[in-house]
Amino acid sequence: MKRIVLSVVVASLAALAPPAPAQTPATGRLMREKLAHTQRILEALTTSNYDLLARESVALSQVASAPGWTVLKMPEYRRHSEEFLRVAEDLAAAARDRDLDLAATRFGALTMSCYQCHKYIKNMRLAR
């Protein structure tokens, strides 16, 4: 009987515990850095600033390669992360080639990659 009561108490305390934070402080910094680079890429595309486009595209790829980027070890998250890095590298290649139309297309794919990953993480948390 004591075990049952103890189990109920432990389960109740676990249920009352605050949920795990949505992201670590390091991941939050990387996401804000990613957002800043993405905003500057949009600026570069809309102003035809090839140098800014190339610089920010490379910087964005570097953010996605940082160790703090892959904090979750789930296969689906890894797939989203690899897709983001691939598209970011494609964007950097279009920037090097000074192809604004292709860069704009890659930027759209990059945005969808972000959206799909954030949607996955949100749905995963809601399912808990």
Feature annotation, model-predicted:
Residues S7-A15:
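Bacterial N-terminal signal peptides
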